[in-house]
């Protein structure tokens, strides 16, 4: 699709309010950027992986949950609608804790994927709020509705034909000149609707898969303020 670019940001580029603001400026600086794919905030995935290991004591679980809360709170305090944003994050933290307690009874790759997926879901939601904070219309989109994969949890294989059909059906109609679509890297879902992940570093893969499905002009990946352009033919 002509005049449609995807911007992808890694964890350090959305790790705090200032980093998110810099990433926001990159997006709005390119009038063709209509879709943004982001990772979890820096450090969050590692914390979630630790919880998913099934080896955390109750005190360690509480300690990590508090770290996760603080990472996101340091972004929320700069935004509007703080009560609603905190409720959203707290909902995820509650689910993370419940899933962690299940992992302590016996973990597996499917449960791990469910736990680690919360990172991208939280960061992308706050990124939408940041866009609105700066007066730019943005819409949150759950990439799992189009990122169809097999059921090999922790390193799922994308089903490109289905991704293309789903992206054209569910994502493409949302794209316009006024709204930025914010979505998640790394995560997907199988045919049963169960959450899967593409493996560590999967956010770049997500952007490439969406780009291929939609035939975008370019994908811009920004990591630590360095920029690479990947052309999709």
PLM regions: where:
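Nucleotide/pyrophosphate-binding catalytic subdomain
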Residues: 1-233
């Amino acid at each position: 699709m002509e005049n449609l670019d995807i911007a992808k940001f890694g964890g350090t580029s959305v790790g705090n309010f200032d980093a998110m603001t810099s990433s926001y400026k990159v997006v709005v600086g390119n009038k063709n950027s209509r879709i943004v794919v982001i990772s979890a905030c820096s450090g969050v995935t590692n914390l979630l992986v630790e919880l998913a290991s099934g080896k955390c004591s109750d005190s360690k679980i509480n300690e990590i949950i508090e770290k996760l809360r603080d990472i996101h709170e340091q972004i929320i305090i700069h935004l509007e609608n703080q009560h609603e944003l905190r409720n959203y994050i707290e909902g995820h933290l509650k689910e993370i804790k419940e899933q962690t307690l299940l992992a302590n009874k016996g973990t597996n790759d499917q449960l791990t994927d469910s736990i680690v997926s919360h990172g991208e879901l939280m960061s992308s939601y706050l990124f939408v709020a940041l866009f609105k904070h700066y007066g730019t219309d943005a819409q949150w989109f759950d990439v799992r509705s189009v990122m169809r994969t097999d059921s090999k949890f922790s390193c799922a294989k994308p089903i490109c034909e289905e991704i293309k059909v789903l992206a054209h059906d569910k994502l493409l109609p949302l794209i316009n000149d006024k709204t930025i679509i914010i979505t998640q890297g790394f995560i997907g879902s199988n045919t049963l609707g169960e959450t899967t992940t593409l493996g560590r570093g999967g956010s770049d893969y997500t952007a490439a898969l969406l780009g291929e499905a939609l035939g975008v002009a370019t994908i811009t990946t920004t990591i630590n303020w360095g920029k690479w352009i990947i052309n999709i033919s």
